[in-house]
UniProtKB/Swiss-Prot annotation:
Pathway: Cofactor biosynthesis; adenosylcobalamin biosynthesis; precorrin-2 from uroporphyrinogen III: step 1/1; Cofactor biosynthesis; adenosylcobalamin biosynthesis; sirohydrochlorin from precorrin-2: step 1/1; Porphyrin-containing compound metabolism; siroheme biosynthesis; precorrin-2 from uroporphyrinogen III: step 1/1; Porphyrin-containing compound metabolism; siroheme biosynthesis; siroheme from sirohydrochlorin: step 1/1. The keyword Oxidoreductase applies. This is Siroheme synthase. In the N-terminal section; belongs to the precorrin-2 dehydrogenase / sirohydrochlorin ferrochelatase family. In the C-terminal section; belongs to the precorrin methyltransferase family. Residues 218-461 are annotated as: Uroporphyrinogen-III C-methyltransferase. S-adenosyl-L-methionine binds at residues 227, 303-305, 308, 333-334, 385, 414.
Amino acid sequence: MEFLPISWRLQGKVALLAGGGEVALRKGRLLHRSGAILTVVAPQVCDELLDIVVRSGGSCVVRAFESADLDGVALVICATDDRSTNAEIAKQAQQRGLPVNVVDDPSLGDFIFPAIVDRSPVLISISSSGASPVLARKLRAQLESTLPARWGRLADLMARFRQPLKDKLSNIGARRLFWEQTLDSPVVEKVLAGKDSEAEAMLAAAIESADATTLSRGEVYLVGAGPGDPDLLTFRALRLLQKADVVLYDRLVGKGIVDLARRDAELVYVGKARDKHALPQDNINELLVHYAKQGKKVCRLKGGDPFIFGRGGEEIDLIVAEGIDFQVVPGITAASGCASYAGIPLTHRDHAQSVRFVTGHRKDGSVDLDWKHLVSETETVVFYMGLVGLREICSQLIAHGRGGDTPIALVSRGTTNLQEVITGRLDQLPDDIEGREIHAPTLIIVGSVVSLHPKFGWFKP
């Protein structure tokens, strides 16, 4: 981030606005709405800005800027039509340690104004970090059209009931879960429909019947994070990820996905490379139980789909044995996601009538598969975690009847901006990549459908 979004209480603070024209007027309106006291300095000041200054309880000085104008102010806005004047005012303000905004010239200042969607007390700020104010305004317009006007009333209602809920529930986790459930309840629709008294009665009744024991009960979410691209995360996965108190994630989950977790969530890295586990599987299982028994909502975030070579079944075994509530959220498995991004349809009427997923290595590191059932010319075979065993995979397929000229693809870091697709022949690919640096995770696709990659390959990172 180039700029840190913050919410700053300006009520009762003096803001110096250098400039008296249309640009200064726009900033003056915004500052007045925030409760700031305006001091305007400019050789000429438009009537509307002068009126805003009076209503804010501030003052207007009709002359050029002087250093003494900086005395006693909390922030400075430079909005004159002269860049050198703006630069000089900004320089003097910064020498005093005052935060400065230079309109339409962020390089000279310390902060910028975002586009704002105002549903007070709910505020949404949108910024392009000065790169494209037009883009920020467009995003704001889209949000304005979709966000109900009465969200602010809902926030006010929740604020009024915060203390009664604290009196009822001492556990902060239980209170957070109560509010999450409230936001999925008919209370919201009542407020949005203008039926405030009905909403208030429903909320009061819900607080009265709130059960700390039930709300404090731990739960485990086994969530498939998909093959890498955060855009492939499901809505349910995102919702539970942002609800979790603790997130256990492994190497196959990209940082862009982990960053979607709640800012105050505890993040626990558990590794899970092919043969180098930061934590053994048994320890991971025990951690899930440990956190859940503390009453926490635990998200076990796994690359791909939890039930397709994700060892999700092993993790659920202990959870079930301990009587802990759990949910399983499917994810787009690597075979589907990586093949799609590589432009390789796993089935095709003219090439393959079936597809088979197999693991490229076992617990002991071997590649011991039922090879005779993997050589059908009308079937696509996808190998997970097969990079280390690639040479053996190719030789065994050929030895059991698959043609040496069968197309094969190796997809590295699929669906991400670092995706690489290497195609070749079954009898040549191991030699083709000898000495090349191939990054995990990888996926191997064998079958004539691979020949469609040059034609269908649409993703160009």
